[in-house]
Amino acid sequence: MDSRDIQALTAVKLYYGEGLTQSQVATELGVSRPTVSKLLNLGRERGYVRIEIHDPREEASETATQMRDRYQLNDVRLAQPARAGNAVLLRELGRVGAELLDELVVDGTLLGVSWGKTMYSVSTQLKSKDVSGVEIVQLKGGMSHSDKSTNDIRTIGAFCHAFHAYARTLPLPVIFDSVETKRIVEQDRFIASVLALGRTVDIAVFTVGAVDHDSLALNLGQLSTTEKDLLVERAVGDACSRFYRADGGIALPEVDARTVGISLSDLRRIPTRVLVAGGAHKAAAIDVALRTNLATHLVIDDATAERLLALDSPDSPAAPASPGSPGSPDSSTPLTATE
């Protein structure tokens, strides 16, 4: 630890521990006020001080209760961004999602993790937890063939660091060029074992995406222009890179057949399914995901939750017993039955 770190520690203790103002800290240390500000920032970066905000609205509010009742969820946590902006929203969703996972993960948990900007935000805000025997399983391929990054490795790495866990990764693209190539790769013993493990995790944490031409899932270099256009036209969202329509059916079966990772029907079989998603642009994708039973636990921002509650209550399509059957969310036909 060098002299700068020691000085930062002293500044942190005076400012946060003793309640001195930055000007008073500057006087104590014999430095300028801007220097104190830099020392406090350094202290936060080094982890010398951790600021925890407990907002009771995140766990107990009328909105959360209504969301639980509307979508028959086990738990709903509401992020309450202090100001507008996508970066602020992502950070708050990630923080609340990380707090929920800290409660759910215990010794021996098999945790399935997806990727995306929201998942990366969750991963960067996880706190170290004293658990053992935890394994982190990547739920879908994450290699990109473009300049867009999925941050899959960094996301998985952060989860492993927080929970002292072993990683089971899928070093593959999420969508292959052909069904034949995908099937050959899936026959590899290592790949097959990770995919099988993903179907048996105790907890799955994932996000959903809106589908437009700027979506990350459409810009990894794995889809043709025609396929992108069709997905934008037909799909309302994607979960684990499985694109679905407004009625819950698979938007483009030929793309779904080339996709490596957990299917929507297998996702529904996971005992605890944590969906972390927010923003007005994702409202329709979140609504369909919840109505089709993709999640048991939800982390969402308050404004988007209110938007969903304002929707007319639709008939809730539910997944039939067997995947691929007529009306299944994993088939191209719409859902008609409820459970």
Regions found by a protein language model. Name each.
Residues E135-M143:
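Catalytic or ion-translocation cores adjacent to nucleophile or general acid/base/metal-coordination motifs
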Residues D315-T333:
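Intrinsically disordered, low-complexity tandem-repeat regions
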Residues L111-S121, V211-D212, G279-K282:
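Gly/Ser/Thr-rich loops at beta-strand to alpha-helix junctions
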Residues A79-P81, L139, L170-L172:
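Conserved beta-strand termini and adjacent loop/short-helix elements that scaffold enzyme active sites
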Residues Q7-A26, M67-A84, T109-S114, M119-Y120:
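Short N-terminal secondary-structure initiator segments
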Residues P34, K38-L110, T124-S132, S144-S149, ...:
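HTH-adjacent hinge/linker in prokaryotic transcriptional regulators
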Residues T118-K129, L216-T225:
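Short Gly/Thr/Asp-enriched flexible loops that form oxyanion-binding sites at enzyme active sites
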Residues D2-V12, Y16-G30, T35-N41, G47-H54, ...:
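Conserved phosphate- and dinucleotide-binding cores of soluble alpha/beta proteins
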